[in-house]
């Protein structure tokens, strides 16, 4: 999952990035986290926004604040889930103006990030099939639409995916049946 964090404070970006990485490790999700330090910089990165599946925005940033950034991004990407993150509770109602998916306070991120991510991932995945296999590399969850192709090499099958390649020792017809039933 491609996640963007936009916050002008490097310590806050690192804290959130670490919490998300810990969550991904605990729940067996793989996140590609990209960080930006300004709303202006983020709005210029169209290819990153097109690939983004979840955006965390600090509200109180210099120059272009998180609310203005969210408004600009939502104009082009209305379905992109945006989580507003701030140290100030008085901004909570402003989140409704930009149709934010969530509002998180920085001082209790560690306590709220898991529930937030559980809910957001469930919403994002509602229309995507998740497959779980025991590969040579370990048990890995994949989105069906992330599989590019499967190739047979000797006694194993190799999955070529957006995440990389994974090997499994199963017959191809067994894999076909599993994929049909998932």
Give each language-model segment a name.
Residues 37, 105-106, 170:
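Short loop/edge segments at beta-strand edges and connector loops
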Residues 24-38, 45:
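Short hydrophobic/Thr-rich beta-strand motif most characteristic of the beta2 strand and flanking loop
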Residues 44-45, 49-126:
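CheY-like receiver
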Residues 115-182:
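Conserved binding/recognition cores within well-folded domains
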Residues 1-21, 55:
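Conserved acidic segment of CheY-like receiver
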């Amino acid at each position: 999952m491609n996640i963007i964090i936009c916050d002008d404070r490097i310590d806050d970006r690192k804290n959130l990035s670490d919490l998300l990485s810990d969550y991904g490790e605990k729940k067996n999700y793989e996140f590609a986290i990209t960080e930006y330090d300004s709303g202006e910089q983020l709005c210029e990165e169209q290819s990153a926004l097109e690939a983004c599946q979840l955006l965390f925005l600090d509200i109180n940033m210099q120059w272009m604040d998180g609310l203005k950034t969210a408004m600009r991004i939502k104009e082009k990407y209305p379905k992109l889930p945006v989580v507003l993150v701030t140290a100030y509770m008085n901004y909570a109602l402003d989140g409704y103006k930009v149709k934010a998916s969530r509002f998180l306070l920085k001082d209790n991120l560690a306590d709220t990030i898991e529930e937030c991510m559980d809910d957001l991932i469930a919403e994002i995945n509602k229309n995507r099939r998740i497959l779980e296999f025991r590969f040579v590399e370990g048990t890995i969850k994949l989105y069906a639409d992330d599989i590019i192709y499967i190739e047979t090499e000797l006694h194993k099958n190799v999955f070529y995916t957006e995440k990389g390649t994974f090997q499994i020792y199963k017959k191809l017809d067994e894999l076909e049946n599993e994929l049909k039933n998932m």
